[in-house]
């Protein structure tokens, strides 16, 4: 009879150390002296492995020697297909002890083809200068094909590694590279962020001690992918760095059954869980008409938000749906960050819930000023406060002339601090473009400050400029999403394309079937709404369901949609 698995406990008899370690390996060495650890769940929400930090450390050390036995040298890159399972976690930490540079990479998407995925990972492996690829057992054939195509020295699963030959493990220092994080961007020319141990540990301190104010009684849970910074750092490395137990649910499980996340939060009395806005929206939609009797969210004290633009209506719907199950709107915590800063740059105060500024969109577009909207204005929009910069980190908002703007002045956001990257991997040109010699990083985001807190209004690369107006594509998208019957969040994508005498606004709309008349009516409804509400003449094109591309964190990728449109992917 198979022994029943027991999850690792929440509580520990040790005093919490808030990531005050020089390296990630030393953080795991300390975590291994206690009882806490990682619990890994199946697509159906069943526990498949309990991995105490003590066991993880022992297995990672053995695997580190096995990696060195295939000829890997200290500093070599290792491509890891980031399945949410014990083997990925073991492989990642084996790389740490071996002095190798793990580069987590995405799994294939349900709608993606084999050939496209193999080409994508081959490109990423080349960009990472990896000569080793390790993947999950379920993708072993694909891994072998990628290895052959990319000319890798080793491509397989952990079981394929040779036996431990007793190789000596290197001494790891704070200056050593820790891992390679691919930021969202072109899959043909991907950009890897080189994160060193000292930057990672600085961010883990800021997140666990200052942002989340972790307690010994805390427990985290996540469905976020481990190849994305919010999943990897936020819910694997940060919990480990403060000896917190974490429960990991595969991303695919959440996408198919989002209420598994809610159920597991209640079942394991989790206190910390994060999601982009769309995750909360999906849960609120799926729970409609269902009983809340088996859900208990009363322990959830930090319901974090990150990874996409924060939208208030879906979050209000989530509160309304789950308040009867004990969820408090005071649990919401807005945050701001990016892979180039390891993960987090700012976090809103705990226990206060979402705080928003309701702004006059016309003044925002015309004057780049954050001015309160008049009562009852149709051109008003809420923007969430994402808190002040984390301790030892700094955020500035600069105008086109490079000068720091006063509060409520909207401009480009720059960041500085111990968590900011030292460079992109093997890409000095891109590094020089975004990172100044004095350490200030051009984030590529636009926003403003109010009472010392940062507010994000959008991405600079997405901004649509028409007749001197700065138009945010999400304003157009959200108007259509919210007001056109049959459209859901994420069904609309807006961007500008070059044209004469000025750029043309294109709006792609995911349409689910319908005859010719109903499709024509949908196009006209969207165009009329954007014309009357925003004063924008848009070319509206209907595309198929699931046709709009997403980033690794599940948010809409306007840049990929624009590239596909210009390439004729969506037809004439």
From Swiss-Prot:
Pfam families in UniProt: AMP-binding
UniProt xrefs under InterPro entries: AMP-bd_C_sf, AMP-dep_synth/lig_dom, ANL_N_sf, FAAL/FAAC
Entry keyword set: Ligase, Lipid metabolism
Inactivation phenotype: Deletion mutant cannot form bacterial ceramide. Mutants are impaired in growth at elevated temperatures but are resistant towards the antibiotic polymyxin B.
EC number(s) reported in the record: 6.2.1.-
Listed GO CC annotations: plasma membrane
Pathway note: Lipid metabolism; sphingolipid metabolism
GO BP term, pick one: fatty acid biosynthetic process
Disulphide-bridged cysteine pairs: none
Source organism, top-level taxon: Bacteria
One Gene Ontology MF term: ligase activity
Family statement drawn from the similarity comment of this UniProt entry: Belongs to the ATP-dependent AMP-binding enzyme family.
PANTHER family (UniProt xref): DISCO-INTERACTING PROTEIN 2, DISCO-INTERACTING PROTEIN 2 DIP2 -RELATED
Function per UniProt: Involved in de novo bacterial ceramide synthesis.
NCBIfam families: PRK09192.1 (NF006624)
Protein name: Putative acyl-CoA synthetase CCNA_01223
Organism for this UniProt entry: Caulobacter vibrioides (strain NA1000 / CB15N)
């Amino acid at each position: 009879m198979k022994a029943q698995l027991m999850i690792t406990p929440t509580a520990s008899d040790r005093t919490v150390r808030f990531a005050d370690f020089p390296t990630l390996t030393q953080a795991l060495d300390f975590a291994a002296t206690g009882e806490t650890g990682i619990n890994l769940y199946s697509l159906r929400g069943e526990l498949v492995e309990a991995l105490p930090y003590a066991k993880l450390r022992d297995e990672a050390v053995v695997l580190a020697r096995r990696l060195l036995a295939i000829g890997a040298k200290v500093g070599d890159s290792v491509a890891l297909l980031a399945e949410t399972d014990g083997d990925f976690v073991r492989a990642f930490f084996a790389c740490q002890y071996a002095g190798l540079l793990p580069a987590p990479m995405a799994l294939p998407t349900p709608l993606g083809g084999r050939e496209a995925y193999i080409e994508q990972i081959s490109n990423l492996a080349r960009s990472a200068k990896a000569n080793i690829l390790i993947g999950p057992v379920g993708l072993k054939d694909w891994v072998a094909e990628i290895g052959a195509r990319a000319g890798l020295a080793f491509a397989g699963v952990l079981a394929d590694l040779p036996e431990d030959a007793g190789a000596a493990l290197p001494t790891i220092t704070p200056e050593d590279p820790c891992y390679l994080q691919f930021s969202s961007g072109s899959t043909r020319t991907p950009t890897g962020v080189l994160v060193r141990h000292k930057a990672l540990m600085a961010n883990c301190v800021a997140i666990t001690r200052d942002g989340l104010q972790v307690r010994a009684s805390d427990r985290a849970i996540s469905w976020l992918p481990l190849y994305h910074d919010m999943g990897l750092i936020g819910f694997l490395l940060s919990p480990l760095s403060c000896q917190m137990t974490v429960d990991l649910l595969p991303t695919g499980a959440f996408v198919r059954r989002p209420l598994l996340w809610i159920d597991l939060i209640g079942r394991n009395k989790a206190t910390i869980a994060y999601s982009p806005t769309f995750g909360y929206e999906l849960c609120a939609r799926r729970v409609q008409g269902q009983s809340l009797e088996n859900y208990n969210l009363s322990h959830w004290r930090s319901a974090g938000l990150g990874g996409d633009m924060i939208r208030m209506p879906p979050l209000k719907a989530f509160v309304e749906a789950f308040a009867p199950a004990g969820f408090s709107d005071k649990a919401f915590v807005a945050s701001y960050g990016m892979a180039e800063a390891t993960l987090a740059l700012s976090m809103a105060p705990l226990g206060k819930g979402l705080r928003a500024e309701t702004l006059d969109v016309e003044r925002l577009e015309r004057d780049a000023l954050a001015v309160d909207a008049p009562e009852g204005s149709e051109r008003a929009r809420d923007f969430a406060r994402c808190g002040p910069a984390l301790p030892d980190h700094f955020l500035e908002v600069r105008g086109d002339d490079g000068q720091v703007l006063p509060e409520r002045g909207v401009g480009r956001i720059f960041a500085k601090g111990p968590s900011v990257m030292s460079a992109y991997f093997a890409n000095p040109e891109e590094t020089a473009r975004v990172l100044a010699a004095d350490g200030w990083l051009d984030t590529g985001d636009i926003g403003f400050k109010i009472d010392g807190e940062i507010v994000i209004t959008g991405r600079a690369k997405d901004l649509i400029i028409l007749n001197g107006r700065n138009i945010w594509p999400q304003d157009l998208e959200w108007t259509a999403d919210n007001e056109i019957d049959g459209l859901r969040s994420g069904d609309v994508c807006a961007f500008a394309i070059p044209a004469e005498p000025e750029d043309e606004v294109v709006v792609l709309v995911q349409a689910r079937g319908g005859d010719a008349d109903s499709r024509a009516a949908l196009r006209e409804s969207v165009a009329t709404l954007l014309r009357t509400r925003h004063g924008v003449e848009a070319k509206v094109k209907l595309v198929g369901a699931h046709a709009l591309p997403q980033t690794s964190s599940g948010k809409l990728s306007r840049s990929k949609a624009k590239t596909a449109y210009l390439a004729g992917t969506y037809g004439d």
